[in-house]
Swiss-Prot record:
This is 26S proteasome regulatory subunit 10B. Keywords: Acetylation, ATP-binding, Cytoplasm, Nucleotide-binding, Nucleus, Phosphoprotein, Proteasome. Belongs to the AAA ATPase family. The gene is PSMC6. It is found in: Cytoplasm; Nucleus. The lineage of its organism: Eukaryota, Metazoa, Chordata, Craniata, Vertebrata. The modification Phosphoserine is found at S244. GO terms for molecular function: ATP binding; ATP hydrolysis activity; proteasome-activating activity.
Length: 389
Protein backbone atom coordinates (compact mmCIF):
# COMPACT_ATOMS: atom_id res chain seq x y z
CA UNK A 1 0.00 0.00 0.00
CA UNK A 2 2.95 2.29 0.62
CA UNK A 3 4.28 2.17 -2.94
CA UNK A 4 1.13 3.50 -4.72
CA UNK A 5 0.91 6.31 -2.14
CA UNK A 6 4.53 7.33 -2.68
CA UNK A 7 4.03 7.19 -6.42
CA UNK A 8 0.87 9.31 -6.19
CA UNK A 9 2.69 11.81 -3.93
CA UNK A 10 5.60 12.06 -6.37
CA UNK A 11 3.18 12.56 -9.27
CA UNK A 12 1.40 15.28 -7.28
CA UNK A 13 4.69 17.06 -6.54
CA UNK A 14 5.71 16.79 -10.17
CA UNK A 15 2.39 18.21 -11.35
CA UNK A 16 2.65 20.98 -8.71
CA UNK A 17 6.10 22.00 -9.99
CA UNK A 18 4.82 21.93 -13.58
CA UNK A 19 1.87 24.09 -12.52
CA UNK A 20 4.18 26.64 -10.85
CA UNK A 21 6.39 26.71 -13.93
CA UNK A 22 3.42 27.21 -16.25
CA UNK A 23 2.04 29.88 -13.88
CA UNK A 24 5.37 31.75 -13.99
CA UNK A 25 5.47 31.57 -17.78
CA UNK A 26 1.87 32.81 -17.89
CA UNK A 27 2.80 35.86 -15.79
CA UNK A 28 5.73 36.60 -18.11
CA UNK A 29 3.46 36.31 -21.14
CA UNK A 30 0.92 38.65 -19.53
CA UNK A 31 3.67 41.25 -18.95
CA UNK A 32 4.79 40.85 -22.56
CA UNK A 33 1.19 41.26 -23.70
CA UNK A 34 0.86 44.52 -21.71
CA UNK A 35 4.08 45.84 -23.22
CA UNK A 36 3.00 44.87 -26.74
CA UNK A 37 -0.42 46.49 -26.16
CA UNK A 38 1.31 49.75 -25.15
CA UNK A 39 3.51 49.60 -28.25
CA UNK A 40 0.45 48.91 -30.41
CA UNK A 41 -1.46 51.89 -28.95
CA UNK A 42 1.57 54.14 -29.44
CA UNK A 43 1.92 52.99 -33.06
CA UNK A 44 -1.81 53.63 -33.62
CA UNK A 45 -1.52 57.15 -32.19
CA UNK A 46 1.56 57.86 -34.31
CA UNK A 47 -0.26 56.58 -37.40
CA UNK A 48 -3.29 58.79 -36.66
CA UNK A 49 -1.01 61.78 -36.19
CA UNK A 50 0.64 61.10 -39.54
CA UNK A 51 -2.74 60.69 -41.26
CA UNK A 52 -4.29 63.81 -39.67
CA UNK A 53 -4.59 66.99 -41.70
CA UNK A 54 -2.13 69.76 -40.88
CA UNK A 55 -3.11 73.27 -39.83
CA UNK A 56 -2.06 76.75 -40.97
CA UNK A 57 -0.21 79.06 -38.58
CA UNK A 58 -1.73 82.55 -38.42
CA UNK A 59 -1.80 85.71 -36.33
CA UNK A 60 -4.85 87.56 -35.00
CA UNK A 61 -4.98 91.16 -36.30
CA UNK A 62 -8.36 92.41 -35.05
CA UNK A 63 -11.65 91.25 -33.56
CA UNK A 64 -14.60 92.33 -35.73
CA UNK A 65 -17.56 90.89 -33.83
CA UNK A 66 -18.14 88.42 -31.01
CA UNK A 67 -17.52 85.50 -33.39
CA UNK A 68 -15.43 86.94 -36.26
CA UNK A 69 -11.72 87.81 -36.36
CA UNK A 70 -9.32 89.14 -38.97
CA UNK A 71 -6.28 86.85 -39.14
CA UNK A 72 -3.16 86.93 -41.24
CA UNK A 73 -1.79 83.61 -42.50
CA UNK A 74 1.95 83.01 -42.62
CA UNK A 75 1.87 82.87 -46.42
CA UNK A 76 0.55 86.45 -46.65
CA UNK A 77 -3.23 86.80 -47.24
CA UNK A 78 -5.70 88.02 -44.62
CA UNK A 79 -9.02 86.33 -43.83
CA UNK A 80 -12.17 86.98 -41.82
CA UNK A 81 -12.65 83.73 -39.91
CA UNK A 82 -14.67 82.19 -37.13
CA UNK A 83 -13.55 80.52 -33.92
CA UNK A 84 -14.19 77.21 -32.15
CA UNK A 85 -16.83 77.47 -29.41
CA UNK A 86 -14.53 75.81 -26.85
CA UNK A 87 -11.89 78.57 -27.11
CA UNK A 88 -11.88 81.53 -24.73
CA UNK A 89 -12.30 84.51 -27.09
CA UNK A 90 -10.93 86.98 -24.54
CA UNK A 91 -7.48 85.42 -25.06
CA UNK A 92 -7.57 86.10 -28.82
CA UNK A 93 -5.92 89.50 -28.61
CA UNK A 94 -4.14 91.18 -31.55
CA UNK A 95 -0.76 89.53 -32.07
CA UNK A 96 -1.80 86.10 -30.73
CA UNK A 97 -0.50 83.17 -32.80
CA UNK A 98 -3.23 80.67 -33.70
CA UNK A 99 -3.71 77.45 -35.69
CA UNK A 100 -6.23 77.62 -38.57
CA UNK A 101 -8.13 74.72 -40.13
CA UNK A 102 -6.88 73.84 -43.63
CA UNK A 103 -10.31 73.96 -45.30
CA UNK A 104 -12.57 76.32 -43.29
CA UNK A 105 -9.74 78.51 -41.81
CA UNK A 106 -11.53 78.39 -38.44
CA UNK A 107 -9.34 79.22 -35.43
CA UNK A 108 -8.73 75.80 -33.84
CA UNK A 109 -6.33 76.57 -30.94
CA UNK A 110 -3.89 79.07 -29.49
CA UNK A 111 -0.17 78.77 -30.17
CA UNK A 112 2.64 79.97 -27.88
CA UNK A 113 4.65 83.05 -28.77
CA UNK A 114 7.40 82.42 -31.32
CA UNK A 115 10.77 82.17 -29.55
CA UNK A 116 14.10 83.06 -31.14
CA UNK A 117 16.46 80.02 -31.15
CA UNK A 118 19.10 82.05 -29.28
CA UNK A 119 16.62 82.87 -26.49
CA UNK A 120 15.49 79.22 -26.42
CA UNK A 121 19.11 78.12 -25.93
CA UNK A 122 19.51 80.68 -23.13
CA UNK A 123 16.50 79.22 -21.31
CA UNK A 124 17.89 75.67 -21.52
CA UNK A 125 21.24 76.56 -19.99
CA UNK A 126 21.64 74.25 -16.98
CA UNK A 127 22.86 76.22 -13.93
CA UNK A 128 23.90 72.98 -12.22
CA UNK A 129 23.21 71.88 -8.67
CA UNK A 130 25.08 74.55 -6.67
CA UNK A 131 24.16 75.14 -3.03
CA UNK A 132 25.05 78.14 -0.88
CA UNK A 133 27.17 75.88 1.36
CA UNK A 134 29.55 75.37 -1.59
CA UNK A 135 30.35 79.11 -1.69
CA UNK A 136 32.90 80.09 0.93
CA UNK A 137 33.61 83.52 2.38
CA UNK A 138 30.61 85.31 0.82
CA UNK A 139 27.92 84.99 3.51
CA UNK A 140 27.15 88.74 3.56
CA UNK A 141 26.96 88.93 -0.26
CA UNK A 142 24.72 85.83 -0.37
CA UNK A 143 22.34 87.46 2.15
CA UNK A 144 22.15 90.69 0.12
CA UNK A 145 21.56 88.81 -3.15
CA UNK A 146 18.84 86.59 -1.66
CA UNK A 147 17.04 89.67 -0.26
CA UNK A 148 16.88 91.26 -3.72
CA UNK A 149 16.21 88.20 -5.92
CA UNK A 150 14.84 85.34 -3.84
CA UNK A 151 12.67 87.12 -1.26
CA UNK A 152 10.40 89.00 -3.76
CA UNK A 153 9.75 85.73 -5.66
CA UNK A 154 9.09 83.50 -2.64
CA UNK A 155 7.45 85.98 -0.19
CA UNK A 156 6.06 88.99 -2.10
CA UNK A 157 3.50 89.62 0.66
CA UNK A 158 6.32 90.87 2.94
CA UNK A 159 6.89 93.83 0.62
CA UNK A 160 3.13 94.47 0.32
CA UNK A 161 2.75 94.62 4.11
CA UNK A 162 5.62 97.10 4.47
CA UNK A 163 4.34 99.06 1.45
CA UNK A 164 7.48 99.11 -0.73
CA UNK A 165 8.10 98.03 -4.33
CA UNK A 166 10.38 94.95 -4.57
CA UNK A 167 13.81 95.56 -6.16
CA UNK A 168 14.14 94.65 -9.85
CA UNK A 169 17.75 93.56 -9.94
CA UNK A 170 21.30 93.81 -8.71
CA UNK A 171 24.83 94.22 -10.02
CA UNK A 172 27.65 91.90 -8.93
CA UNK A 173 31.03 93.52 -9.45
CA UNK A 174 34.57 92.77 -8.36
CA UNK A 175 37.85 91.20 -9.51
CA UNK A 176 37.79 88.11 -11.77
CA UNK A 177 37.52 84.71 -10.08
CA UNK A 178 35.75 85.88 -6.92
CA UNK A 179 32.52 83.90 -7.49
CA UNK A 180 30.10 86.29 -9.25
CA UNK A 181 28.85 83.70 -11.76
CA UNK A 182 28.85 81.01 -9.05
CA UNK A 183 26.53 83.17 -6.91
CA UNK A 184 24.05 83.55 -9.79
CA UNK A 185 24.16 79.79 -10.47
CA UNK A 186 23.46 79.08 -6.80
CA UNK A 187 20.40 81.38 -6.79
CA UNK A 188 19.07 79.75 -9.99
CA UNK A 189 19.56 76.19 -8.73
CA UNK A 190 17.97 76.88 -5.31
CA UNK A 191 14.84 78.56 -6.74
CA UNK A 192 12.14 76.71 -8.67
CA UNK A 193 11.87 79.24 -11.51
CA UNK A 194 12.99 79.81 -15.10
CA UNK A 195 16.56 80.96 -15.67
CA UNK A 196 17.99 82.83 -18.68
CA UNK A 197 21.80 82.80 -18.86
CA UNK A 198 22.92 85.55 -21.23
CA UNK A 199 26.49 86.24 -22.31
CA UNK A 200 26.26 89.92 -23.24
CA UNK A 201 28.76 89.74 -26.09
CA UNK A 202 26.60 87.11 -27.87
CA UNK A 203 23.72 89.64 -28.15
CA UNK A 204 25.69 91.97 -30.44
CA UNK A 205 24.77 91.28 -34.09
CA UNK A 206 26.28 92.66 -37.28
CA UNK A 207 22.85 93.65 -38.67
CA UNK A 208 21.29 96.90 -37.46
CA UNK A 209 18.34 96.35 -35.12
CA UNK A 210 18.90 92.62 -34.56
CA UNK A 211 20.56 93.09 -31.16
CA UNK A 212 17.67 95.26 -29.89
CA UNK A 213 15.15 92.73 -31.24
CA UNK A 214 16.92 89.94 -29.32
CA UNK A 215 16.71 91.98 -26.10
CA UNK A 216 12.94 92.47 -26.68
CA UNK A 217 12.37 88.76 -27.33
CA UNK A 218 14.41 87.85 -24.27
CA UNK A 219 12.25 90.01 -21.98
CA UNK A 220 9.02 88.87 -23.70
CA UNK A 221 10.02 85.25 -23.03
CA UNK A 222 10.78 86.10 -19.39
CA UNK A 223 7.36 87.81 -18.94
CA UNK A 224 5.58 84.80 -20.49
CA UNK A 225 7.44 82.37 -18.19
CA UNK A 226 7.29 84.12 -14.81
CA UNK A 227 8.86 83.75 -12.28
CA UNK A 228 12.09 84.18 -14.21
CA UNK A 229 15.67 85.28 -13.47
CA UNK A 230 17.76 86.86 -16.24
CA UNK A 231 21.50 86.64 -15.59
CA UNK A 232 23.60 88.84 -17.89
CA UNK A 233 27.30 88.05 -17.57
CA UNK A 234 30.00 90.52 -18.68
CA UNK A 235 27.43 93.33 -18.99
CA UNK A 236 30.18 95.84 -19.87
CA UNK A 237 30.08 94.35 -23.42
CA UNK A 238 26.81 96.23 -24.13
CA UNK A 239 26.39 98.46 -21.05
CA UNK A 240 29.35 100.77 -21.61
CA UNK A 241 29.14 104.53 -21.14
CA UNK A 242 27.54 106.31 -24.15
CA UNK A 243 29.45 108.97 -26.10
CA UNK A 244 28.71 111.17 -29.13
CA UNK A 245 31.57 110.10 -31.41
CA UNK A 246 32.09 106.56 -32.60
CA UNK A 247 31.70 104.11 -35.45
CA UNK A 248 28.44 102.57 -36.66
CA UNK A 249 29.24 99.47 -34.57
CA UNK A 250 29.48 101.62 -31.43
CA UNK A 251 26.14 103.26 -32.24
CA UNK A 252 24.53 99.83 -32.69
CA UNK A 253 25.77 98.78 -29.22
CA UNK A 254 24.34 102.04 -27.82
CA UNK A 255 20.95 101.27 -29.44
CA UNK A 256 21.09 97.83 -27.80
CA UNK A 257 21.77 99.47 -24.42
CA UNK A 258 18.82 101.87 -24.89
CA UNK A 259 16.51 98.93 -25.63
CA UNK A 260 17.79 97.19 -22.48
CA UNK A 261 17.16 100.34 -20.40
CA UNK A 262 13.63 100.63 -21.82
CA UNK A 263 12.79 96.98 -21.12
CA UNK A 264 14.09 97.20 -17.54
CA UNK A 265 12.22 100.39 -16.64
CA UNK A 266 9.66 101.13 -19.37
CA UNK A 267 5.87 101.29 -19.23
CA UNK A 268 5.59 97.48 -19.34
CA UNK A 269 6.52 96.43 -15.80
CA UNK A 270 8.61 93.33 -15.11
CA UNK A 271 6.49 91.96 -12.19
CA UNK A 272 8.20 88.65 -11.26
CA UNK A 273 11.20 89.00 -13.58
CA UNK A 274 14.48 89.66 -11.76
CA UNK A 275 17.80 90.81 -13.22
CA UNK A 276 21.30 89.83 -12.11
CA UNK A 277 24.21 91.49 -13.92
CA UNK A 278 27.89 90.73 -13.43
CA UNK A 279 31.02 92.61 -14.48
CA UNK A 280 34.64 93.11 -13.45
CA UNK A 281 34.72 96.61 -15.00
CA UNK A 282 32.01 98.65 -13.20
CA UNK A 283 33.84 101.92 -13.99
CA UNK A 284 32.93 101.58 -17.70
CA UNK A 285 29.15 101.13 -17.20
CA UNK A 286 26.60 103.77 -18.21
CA UNK A 287 25.10 105.76 -15.27
CA UNK A 288 21.55 105.20 -16.58
CA UNK A 289 22.01 101.44 -16.15
CA UNK A 290 23.25 101.79 -12.57
CA UNK A 291 20.47 103.99 -11.20
CA UNK A 292 17.93 102.63 -8.67
CA UNK A 293 14.81 101.33 -10.40
CA UNK A 294 16.93 99.30 -12.80
CA UNK A 295 19.75 97.92 -10.66
CA UNK A 296 18.61 98.64 -7.11
CA UNK A 297 21.52 97.04 -5.29
CA UNK A 298 25.22 96.90 -6.14
CA UNK A 299 27.05 94.04 -4.43
CA UNK A 300 30.84 94.32 -4.24
CA UNK A 301 32.54 90.91 -4.24
CA UNK A 302 36.11 91.63 -3.18
CA UNK A 303 39.12 89.34 -2.82
CA UNK A 304 38.60 86.99 0.15
CA UNK A 305 40.32 87.66 3.49
CA UNK A 306 42.30 84.99 5.36
CA UNK A 307 39.29 83.35 7.01
CA UNK A 308 37.33 83.36 3.72
CA UNK A 309 40.33 81.85 1.90
CA UNK A 310 40.43 79.08 4.51
CA UNK A 311 36.72 78.30 3.96
CA UNK A 312 37.12 78.30 0.16
CA UNK A 313 40.22 76.07 0.31
CA UNK A 314 38.43 73.52 2.50
CA UNK A 315 35.49 73.42 0.04
CA UNK A 316 37.80 72.84 -2.96
CA UNK A 317 39.92 70.28 -1.08
CA UNK A 318 36.87 68.32 0.14
CA UNK A 319 36.60 65.79 -2.75
CA UNK A 320 40.40 65.28 -2.98
CA UNK A 321 41.90 62.00 -1.68
CA UNK A 322 44.30 63.11 1.06
CA UNK A 323 46.88 61.27 3.16
CA UNK A 324 48.08 62.42 6.56
CA UNK A 325 47.35 65.69 8.32
CA UNK A 326 46.77 68.74 6.08
CA UNK A 327 47.63 72.11 7.63
CA UNK A 328 45.21 74.41 5.78
CA UNK A 329 46.25 77.45 7.84
CA UNK A 330 49.85 77.17 6.63
CA UNK A 331 48.68 76.96 3.01
CA UNK A 332 46.38 79.98 3.42
CA UNK A 333 49.19 82.09 4.89
CA UNK A 334 51.07 81.71 1.57
CA UNK A 335 47.98 82.62 -0.49
CA UNK A 336 47.79 86.36 0.12
CA UNK A 337 45.92 88.10 -2.73
CA UNK A 338 44.40 84.86 -4.08
CA UNK A 339 40.79 84.73 -5.31
CA UNK A 340 38.46 81.72 -5.21
CA UNK A 341 39.54 80.50 -8.65
CA UNK A 342 43.21 80.63 -7.60
CA UNK A 343 42.49 78.49 -4.54
CA UNK A 344 40.69 75.97 -6.75
CA UNK A 345 43.76 75.98 -8.98
CA UNK A 346 45.98 75.27 -5.93
CA UNK A 347 44.02 72.04 -5.33
CA UNK A 348 44.31 71.08 -9.01
CA UNK A 349 48.07 71.73 -9.03
CA UNK A 350 48.47 69.72 -5.80
CA UNK A 351 46.72 66.82 -7.52
CA UNK A 352 49.06 67.19 -10.50
CA UNK A 353 52.11 67.02 -8.18
CA UNK A 354 50.68 63.83 -6.63
CA UNK A 355 50.18 62.27 -10.10
CA UNK A 356 53.73 63.26 -11.06
CA UNK A 357 55.02 61.47 -7.92
CA UNK A 358 52.93 58.38 -8.86
CA UNK A 359 50.67 58.70 -5.80
CA UNK A 360 46.93 58.06 -5.48
CA UNK A 361 46.61 60.71 -2.77
CA UNK A 362 47.69 64.26 -1.99
CA UNK A 363 49.96 65.13 0.95
CA UNK A 364 50.82 68.41 2.69
CA UNK A 365 53.99 68.92 0.64
CA UNK A 366 51.97 68.78 -2.63
CA UNK A 367 49.75 71.62 -1.39
CA UNK A 368 52.77 73.72 -0.37
CA UNK A 369 54.42 73.26 -3.78
CA UNK A 370 51.13 74.09 -5.52
CA UNK A 371 50.50 77.31 -3.59
CA UNK A 372 54.03 78.55 -4.33
CA UNK A 373 53.60 77.75 -8.03
CA UNK A 374 50.26 79.61 -8.26
CA UNK A 375 51.74 82.55 -6.31
CA UNK A 376 54.55 82.83 -8.90
CA UNK A 377 52.06 82.89 -11.79
CA UNK A 378 49.94 85.55 -9.99
CA UNK A 379 52.80 88.04 -10.35
CA UNK A 380 52.06 88.25 -14.09
CA UNK A 381 48.53 89.59 -13.53
CA UNK A 382 47.73 93.30 -13.72
CA UNK A 383 45.67 94.81 -10.91
CA UNK A 384 42.59 97.07 -11.06
CA UNK A 385 41.38 99.37 -8.32
CA UNK A 386 37.69 98.57 -7.60
CA UNK A 387 35.95 101.60 -6.15
CA UNK A 388 32.41 101.30 -4.74
CA UNK A 389 29.73 101.94 -7.39
Amino acid sequence: MADPRDKALQDYRKKLLEHKEIDGRLKELREQLKELTKQYEKSENDLKALQSVGQIVGEVLKQLTEEKFIVKATNGPRYVVGCRRQLDKSKLKPGTRVALDMTTLTIMRYLPREVDPLVYNMSHEDPGNVSYSEIGGLSEQIRELREVIELPLTNPELFQRVGIIPPKGCLLYGPPGTGKTLLARAVASQLDCNFLKVVSSSIVDKYIGESARLIREMFNYARDHQPCIIFMDEIDAIGGRRFSEGTSADREIQRTLMELLNQMDGFDTLHRVKMIMATNRPDTLDPALLRPGRLDRKIHIDLPNEQARLDILKIHAGPITKHGEIDYEAIVKLSDGFNGADLGNVCTEAGMFAIRADHDFVVQEDFMKAVRKVADSKKLESKLDYKPV
